[in-house]
Amino acid sequence: DRHVTVIIDVSFSDDVKIIKDFVLNEQCPFIQSKEEEGLIKFEWFIDEETKTGTLIEVFKDPISWEKLADKVIGTPVNIKFNSLFIIEKMTVLGELTDNLEEKLQAAGPMVKNYVGGIN
């Protein structure tokens, strides 16, 4: 299976309304506007009490992830994401391209390669 699932666990200190507004009215529309066909899912889950969240991204393959990352990294929306959230943990289920591995090195992602399963 060539799918790549990216799980980003974050924490935040801003009011939950600010976070939800960013996710729903800025980040999601921005990601959707990039029209990356290989993006299968881009979903947020938030625990308001602990001010933590999880972003799950699923891609058709590693190249699709790299294409979207190239369109997003360094943009104002990406910079705002980095100012609103602290990335506590990034887990990549599947392969990384060499280019993405280099770009994400600072985030210290935990990478787990696919072994098998039922799809």
Language-model-detected regions and their locations in the chain:
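Short S/T/G/P-rich N-terminal loop/turn motif that feeds into the first structured element of a domain
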Residues: 1-53, 60-71, 83-119
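A short, acidic, amphipathic alpha-helical segment used as a generic capping/interface helix at domain edges
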Residues: 73-80
